[in-house]
């Protein structure tokens, strides 16, 4: 560790990746000098927080930067200020700041350290960048004058686009406010995250494909989730997968045919204002689906769908038999239950329902969904993890 004294300041190895700057004040009952303060900081915090937050180790690895100490004595007492730069995250920086306040002695004297504030260095830099950019635009460009508010917005949008981070074990593209926000917005890809950041929305994270990452699933258990997806079939597919594995609270969609990454600020805000609770979405989907089913079954004016399925249930119950039904709920094929999976796999039949005297398994649900069936009716549910929204699963006792 290297240290030197310049103009009353003790400095240590600099760190150009500083995120936060701890500002603290110190007061000692007696005359103390700078080396006493530094010795107390390192000596009295050593071993206090374990190896991961040991000050000496943090400085060796560059996770804390130059420590500034300024102190003066007056009337037999000493007063001063301490600044500790940190490239740790918010929580670790706060713990480090709290550790400073546990120091009770400096040299031979009783002392007290109090944290005054923790400065977000990057936020301060961004503010200076905006102010300097405004001056540069005014001084060095001969174009017609731009309103100050517009200049600020242009520069801020550019800066926000640089705020993208990698989040979770899958290193998902995200805004910087995921951890601190109670609500998050889930989008499809990195370009969507960048567009929302550009317009000031920081609690956004991308799934990066149709296979929903574990990080998204875990976040959905703790936070209010709005799925904000493209207004096309790709958005439909991602939404379907999200609803199966994650706890989604609201759904927002881009205008039909548009992608989230191309939306203007006005379109983004309008889409988010018009978000729909997921419960309402299911009702709308159910009504639309039942409407399609009524059209398919137009040739059956007297019997409801439930009545017809109930009749088929009575026919297979106790016989270990399965029936595959067409769009009008007429029997296409009747087979032993043990042959049902094999028949569905090997036959390219287009049916509407499966009614069988057996247990509804995840394997059978996946196969029925793949074959685009609308209903599957069985004795009871087995170990089922997820059910596609396109398939309605019914047990005998529900009919």
UniProtKB/Swiss-Prot annotation:
One of its GO terms (biological process) is DNA replication, synthesis of primer. GO terms for molecular function: DNA-directed RNA polymerase activity; metal ion binding; poly(A) binding. Keywords: DNA replication, DNA-directed RNA polymerase, Exosome, Magnesium, Metal-binding, Nucleotidyltransferase, Primosome, Transcription, Transferase. Residues 182-268 form the Toprim domain. It is an enzyme of class 2 (transferase). The keyword Cytoplasm does not apply. It catalyses: ssDNA + n NTP = ssDNA/pppN(pN)n-1 hybrid + (n-1) diphosphate. Mg(2+) 2 binds at residues 230, 232. GO terms for cellular component: cytoplasm; DNA-directed RNA polymerase complex; exosome (RNase complex); primosome complex. Mg(2+) 1 binds at residues 188, 230. Gene3D superfamilies: 3.40.1360.10. Binds two Mg(2+) per subunit. Its EC number is 2.7.7.101. Its cofactor is Mg(2+). Belongs to the archaeal DnaG primase family. RNA polymerase that catalyzes the synthesis of short RNA molecules used as primers for DNA polymerase during DNA replication. Also part of the exosome, which is a complex involved in RNA degradation. Acts as a poly(A)-binding protein that enhances the interaction between heteromeric, adenine-rich transcripts and the exosome. This is DNA primase DnaG. It comes from Archaeoglobus fulgidus (strain ATCC 49558 / DSM 4304 / JCM 9628 / NBRC 100126 / VC-16).
